[in-house]
């Protein structure tokens, strides 16, 4: 196994440039703890290609690569995550500000909406240092659910903030890509 492969996240430091606001929803009642009235979005070019960035009053709530799907499909997918919001396309960040967010040199507030389990997984992903990778199994053990590897993989696949929440740093135990969206 590579020296970059983490088998324990307990000693990892969380990215200090990220502040997380958590909002939960209940699958049984389809109710959320927050109701956004407006999300502003824009498409920016990045080293990863065309990128969708979404912002609410509480912070960034969406970051997605348009890759082969195209802008319309990616925007439609992200809108499903925030069904009660209204959307407006507008300039959110200058090119310089956007690069500083992707480079993680700018303080950024993230607004996460998901189940308590999903948010627990996404926050654990923030513990993986730049340049390191870990496995679904290690992540499952870290959050205290060692048998929930597939459920964790599903939560990772629903990560609304690719790159900032590093789902791409989680691999199968054998070091191969898992194939869950961007991770």
Where are these regions (language model features)?
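Basic nucleic-acid-binding alpha-helical/helix-turn surface characteristic of O6-alkylguanine DNA
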Residues: 1-146
């Amino acid at each position: 196994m590579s020296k970059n492969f983490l088998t324990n996240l307990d000693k990892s430091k969380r990215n200090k440039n990220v502040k997380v606001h958590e909002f939960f929803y209940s699958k049984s009642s389809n109710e959320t703890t927050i109701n956004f009235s407006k999300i502003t979005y824009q498409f920016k070019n990045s080293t990863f290609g065309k990128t969708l960035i979404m912002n609410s009053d509480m912070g960034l709530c969406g970051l997605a690569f348009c890759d082969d799907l195209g802008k319309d499909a990616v925007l439609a997918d992200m809108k499903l995550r925030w069904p009660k919001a209204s959307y407006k396309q507008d300039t959110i960040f200058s090119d310089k500000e956007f690069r500083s967010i992707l480079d993680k040199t700018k303080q950024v507030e993230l607004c996460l909406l998901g189940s308590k389990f999903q948010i627990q997984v996404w926050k654990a992903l923030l513990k993986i240092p730049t340049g390191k990778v870990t496995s679904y199994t290690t992540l499952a053990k870290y959050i205290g659910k060692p048998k929930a590897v597939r459920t964790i993989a599903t939560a990772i696949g629903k990560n609304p903030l690719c790159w900032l929440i590093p789902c791409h740093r989680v691999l199968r135990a054998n070091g191969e890509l898992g194939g869950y969206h961007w991770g």
